Amino acid sequence: MKLVEVKHPLVKHKLGVMREAEIDTKKFRELATEIGSLLTYEATSDLETEKVTINSWNGPVEIDRIKGKKVTVVPILRAGLGMMDGVLEHVPSARISVVGIYRNEETLKPVPYFQKLASDLEERLAIVVDPMLATGGSMIATLDLLKAKGCKHIKVLVLVAAPEGIKALEAAHPDIELYCASIDSHLNEQGYIIPGLGDAGDKIFGTK
């Protein structure tokens, strides 16, 4: 599995602000979008381009254009919605495929409850977004679902990843790419990432 921890100063600064205990919902939401955008920039750096000729203000000119790669953004509900707009800033024509999976707080196991996927997944690059990669259970279940529907090319974007989740994801899906803003220390007994961000979904949606 390709693992990239994006260490750009802007990413580190924005993530540091997100860790503040008293951050408000508006700021947390804005920063999730901004880091999602920066991770997308990194994750799409290998997209192939081709030369095409267009009519410019000064006549025909040859330009670079992304070569026929269709994209679907896959936010894992609900927290993944907080990163979705950051991806769409760069690929505004992407289809949106939604997967609903929540983590049982007692067993820490993923529980699927909703899916609405693009019809031609086998032809698309899937960019899966979720702020936290903790145990990896929800992400693994999502990727299992995408692959069962024919998706062959998957990149995962998360804000914060725990070593335990990275290990589990690599064991289950060694062929995918994972981009994160930080690899944090560990999971606590409740399955939360330390130091982490707290409950990212609650902070994005202003709920408790």
Curated annotation (Swiss-Prot):
Residues annotated for 5-phospho-alpha-D-ribose 1-diphosphate binding in this entry: 78, 103, 130-138, 199
Keywords attached to this entry: Allosteric enzyme, Glycosyltransferase, GTP-binding, Magnesium, Nucleotide-binding, Transferase
Binding residues annotated for uracil, in chain numbering: 193, 198-200
Pathway named in the protein's UniProt entry: Pyrimidine metabolism; UMP biosynthesis via salvage pathway; UMP from uracil: step 1/1
InterPro entries in the record: PRibTrfase_dom, PRTase-like, Upp_B, UPRTase/APRTase, Ura_phspho_trans
Reactions performed catalytically: UMP + diphosphate = 5-phospho-alpha-D-ribose 1-diphosphate + uracil
Cofactor stoichiometry and binding remark: Binds 1 Mg(2+) ion per subunit. The magnesium is bound as Mg-PRPP.
EC number: 2.4.2.9
Control of this protein's activity: Allosterically activated by GTP.
CDD domains: PRTases_typeI
Cofactor: Mg(2+)
GO biological process, alphabetically ordered: UMP salvage; uracil salvage
Single GO MF annotation: GTP binding
Domain of life: Bacteria
HAMAP family recorded: Upp_B
NCBIfam families: PRK00129.1 (NF001097), upp (TIGR01091)
Function: Catalyzes the conversion of uracil and 5-phospho-alpha-D-ribose 1-diphosphate (PRPP) to UMP and diphosphate.
Family per similarity comment: Belongs to the UPRTase family.
Protein's recorded name: Uracil phosphoribosyltransferase
Native source organism of the sequence: Haemophilus influenzae (strain 86-028NP)
Phylogenetic lineage: Bacteria, Pseudomonadati, Pseudomonadota, Gammaproteobacteria, Pasteurellales
